[in-house]
Amino acid sequence: MSGADLALLGVGALTDLLHRREVSSEEVVRACLARIESLNPKLAAFITVSTEAALRAARRADGELARGRSRGPLHGVPFAVKDALWTKGVRTTNGSRLFEDFVPSEDATVVARLRAAGAVLLGKLNMMELGFGPTLRPPFGVPRNPWDLERTTGGSSSGSASAVAARLVPLTLGADTGGSIRLPAALCGVVGLKPTRGRVSHHGLMGICPPFDSAGPLAASASDCALALAAIAGRDRKDPITTRVAVDDYAGAIGKGLGGVRIGVVRELMQSAMLRPEVRALVADAVTALEKGGARVEEVSIPLIDHASAIYIAIAEPEAAARFRPYLLTRPHDIDVLPRRRLLTASLIPASVIPRARRLGQRLRAQVDEALRAVDVLVSPTTPSPASPIATAGRIESKEEAWTTAAAGRSLFTNPFNITGHPALSVPCGFTAERLPAGLQVIGRYYREADVLRVAAAYESITPWRDRRPEV
């Protein structure tokens, strides 16, 4: 197999080749590095590429395999991470000039766990500034969608999705506060998973709102995400939010099919006036495929979900404004105008609003829990629309554009599950007439990521979307 072909393989395929010693980790890493060198100037997916460190780590991985020591299925597999996650000795910018010289002295827990599993870090990925975009002039280049270089990637884990879609790297980590893993996954045509709150450590994540933040994997398939989640999930003494709930056998859930699975279609999200008709049609087709595949499908109602964005804004945005207040006071012009305005606006939200928003969030959580008592998973569109042209991103000229182009509108269907803390995943479910990807969102019960991954993998197996790649 040629080096160019190696870069196109997913985690599972690479695992088999590496453990059979048919290829070396160094060969795989060199193939990915060559593809990054060729395509990153077009995509701006990577901020930092750690070439020499990656090659050294690959050689160590090869040496261990040669001695009969395997650290698991990720041993020797390349990965990259959103630049909001600490990486020891590698600068971590959080997508901002504010942190362009910050070099952490330790890894984020999720990064450390992937390294401990034998995975090889290639570098750091581009993102919306501070995770709080959109940004008119991103300091490290405009991330571009591999399916159409004039379209947005979504965010804020922009490079995490585009790098997987373009096959620069088979596995990435992102972070999700209101949809920042699932949104770019949907718009770039890959799989992205936000785990249950407390399933994965926050330690070393430069987040926005700790109650809503979560790190998680992005990859070309649900099975690849399952392998990554197994490595990063679990209790962490450095993060009191993490729980002692046992980590499931995620890989074991893959391949179980849809027989006996009960799926609830969220009525309010499917009937949303903000949902573009072509995306609604693709999601409806996905639901039909799930039913034909053996699932039992019914409609469920979550009345308060229509107000989730207001709840989200009232809680998350003041939290972000407080977090970045010192920089707003001392270095405001080192923050792009759009996130700066958004942070300043958020600082004006009265403190009295926040307790009420939290109470409404608890009611929303109860309604989602109630819906999940009757079914195993919920499904909905991931985004209301496909990727928008970069030229119009951030310009708001109508009420519809305010919801479907601005950050709040993009997260209209994803932020409810940051508020409630349920696990949620986006899996590709087809393409629009303009050949732009759309995503199906799958939501599960607390700590039941295995159910979400099972349904996503089963859907992939009965549809052709998993094997589609953009021509970059």
Predicted regions: what they are:
Residues C32, A54, G76, K82, ...:
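Conserved hydrophobic/aromatic pocket- or pore-lining residues that grip, position, or stack substrates
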Residues S25-V29, R59-D62, G252, L275-S301, ...:
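Acyltransferase
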Residues R91, P416-I419:
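Conserved short alpha-helical elements in the N-terminal third of ANL/AMP-binding
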Residues S38, A116, A165-A273, A284-G293, ...:
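Structural helix-boundary/capping segments
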Residues M1-L55, K292-G294, R468-V472:
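An N-terminal boundary/leader segment
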Residues L74-A215, V266-L269, T382-A402:
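Short glycine/serine-rich loop/turn segments
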Residues S2, L74-N94, G252-R267, I315-D369, ...:
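Short helix-loop capping/hinge segments that flank enzyme active sites or metal/cofactor-binding pockets
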Residues E52-D62, G118-A119:
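Long amphipathic alpha-helix in the N-terminal Rossmann-like dinucleotide-binding domain
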